[in-house]
Amino acid sequence: MPDITFPAPESHVPGYLAVPDGQGPWPGVVVVQDVLGMTTDLRRITDRLAASGYLAMAPALYGRRPKIKCMISTIRAHFAGRGAAYDDLVAARDHLIADERCTGKVGLVGFCMGAGFCLVLSSQGIFDASAANYGLLPQDIEPLSRSCPVVASFGAKDRIVAGGTAAKLEAVLARGEVPRDIKEYSDVGHSFMNNWGIPGPVRIIERIARMAYSEPEAEDAWQRILGFFREHLS
């Protein structure tokens, strides 16, 4: 699958595009990175979405130079709820819609920091569905009552996302009667869907930090995401 570049307001952005086999058109999905950036895991996630019938693109939000400045800017944008990173994600959506292989429906999926971006963008009326996995809620959650459909997954043992986040998200979406599937898994922490391929001896650090990959919960979350996208992006 090819690396690409696409136009955005500030400059061109690199990214990774995964295309399904067979004949399109297909719905699109913008895949939003976690704080680690364009990892092998992110490419694998993008490939999985393509294998499930989605024209999937992961923008490299750290792809501009100088890289350290770009990283700081992206992380700040995540917490501020505005900035060039959001413009890049909207530009990625526009790039997919302009692709003749796309049906015109586009969803979002994000993990950790990426899920935070998803939750902010979900209420802006430009995406058709959003999958936010263990993300921080926006500072102002009320716009989420006007969100696109949301599927979200959290770990009860998460040491980064505050306890009660899943319930707060459920409540604000319910107020707006937003289609939703919110689930908190009791036995996992942060990043339980991210399989970074960390060597075995180092995995104890993941477990202590409660950031370890857990296949049963990850696969359950994936099936919920794919089912939700089939319903709302078809």
Identify the residue ranges that each predicted region occupies.
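Short beta-to-alpha linker loops that shape the active-site pocket of alpha/beta-hydrolase fold enzymes
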Residues: 61-64, 136, 188
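Short, proline-enriched alpha-helix->beta-strand connector loops that line the catalytic pocket
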Residues: 145-150, 177-179
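Acidic catalytic loop of the alpha/beta-hydrolase fold
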Residues: 157-162, 190-191
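Short beta-strand/loop motif that positions the catalytic acidic residue
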Residues: 152-154, 158, 185
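Primarily recognizes the serine-hydrolase "nucleophile elbow" in alpha/beta-hydrolase
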Residues: 90-147
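Short alpha-helix in the alpha/beta-hydrolase fold that links the catalytic acid
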Residues: 162-171, 197
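Serine-hydrolase catalytic machinery in alpha/beta-hydrolase-like enzymes
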Residues: 3-101, 196-211
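C-terminal catalytic histidine-bearing segment of alpha/beta-hydrolase fold enzymes
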Residues: 179-234
